[in-house]
Design a protein with these regions (language model features):
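Generic low-polarity alpha-helical segments
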Residues: 1, 12, 17-21, 31-33, ...
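Cofactor-binding active-site loop characterized by glycine-rich and histidine/acidic residues
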Residues: 2-109
C-alpha cells in the first residue's frame, strides 16, 4: 500500500489550501514541508521517497519524522536572516516537544522571516485534537503574528513584517471540493 493511500484523509484536508500554499511557496526562498503526505499533488507522479532527497527542486526539505521541520527552519532563519522561509505542519505536531520548543525560540529570537502554516483539521489518532491543542496555541501569542484563516484566499492573510507569522488554516479532514478541483496557476 502506498504512503499516499495511508494518509488520504490528511492529504484531503490540505487540498483546498493548494492555491494559497502555492502562493506562499512561490514567495519563499526556502520551503519545508513537515506534512509531506498532505502535498502529493506537488510531487512528480513517480516520486516515492519523501525525505532529505532534493530531487524536487522547489521543496527544500520534507520529513516523515514529524516535528523536525520547524526546528530546521529556525536554523535556516538564523543563518540567512534575509531569506523567507515557509513551513507547513499538521496540527498534531503542535503537541510535539521539539515543535513547541522551536515556536518559543523563534518568537523569542523574533525570526520574522518565517511563515508557518498549520493544517488545523482538529483530528488525531486519539480523537478530537482541540481538547488538548487549544492551550498549545497560546504559545504563539506573546511573539508571533497569528492569522486564523477559513477562506483559503491569499489576499485574506494579513502578515506582520516585524514578527514571525503563523497561519492557522481551519480545515476538515476528508472534506474538500470536487475531485476535479483545479490549482490556479
Amino acid at each position: 500500500m502506498s504512503c499516499k493511500r495511508l494518509h488520504d484523509k490528511s492529504y484531503n484536508s490540505v487540498k483546498p489550501l493548494y492555491n494559497v500554499l502555492l502562493k506562499l511557496i512561490q514567495n519563499s526562498d526556502y520551503r519545508l514541508i513537515g506534512k509531506p503526505y498532505g502535498m502529493y499533488d506537488f510531487y512528480p507522479k513517480d516520486y516515492n521517497n519523501v525525505g532529505l532527497d532534493s530531487s524536487i527542486d522547489w521543496i527544500d526539505y520534507a520529513d516523515f519524522t514529524l516535528g523536525n521541520s520547524l526546528g530546521i527552519a529556525e536554523g535556516i532563519a538564523i543563518a540567512e536572516p534575509d531569506k523567507k522561509i515557509f513551513v507547513l505542519i499538521s496540527d498534531s505536531q503542535l503537541n510535539m516537544g521539539n515543535t513547541l520548543e522551536a515556536i518559543v525560540s523563534i518568537g523569542f529570537l523574533n525570526l520574522k522571516n518565517i511563515i508557518l502554516a498549520v493544517d488545523y483539521n482538529d483530528s488525531c489518532s486519539k480523537g478530537v485534537l482541540s481538547e488538548v491543542l487549544e492551550p498549545n496555541l497560546n504559545i504563539f501569542k506573546p511573539n508571533w503574528n497569528i492569522i486564523y484563516n477559513k477562506t483559503y484566499e491569499y489576499n485574506d492573510l494579513k502578515f506582520d513584517k516585524n514578527k514571525p507569522n503563523v497561519i492557522i488554516f481551519d480545515t476538515i479532514k476528508n472534506v474538500y471540493p470536487k475531485s476535479d478541483y483545479k490549482i490556479k496557476v
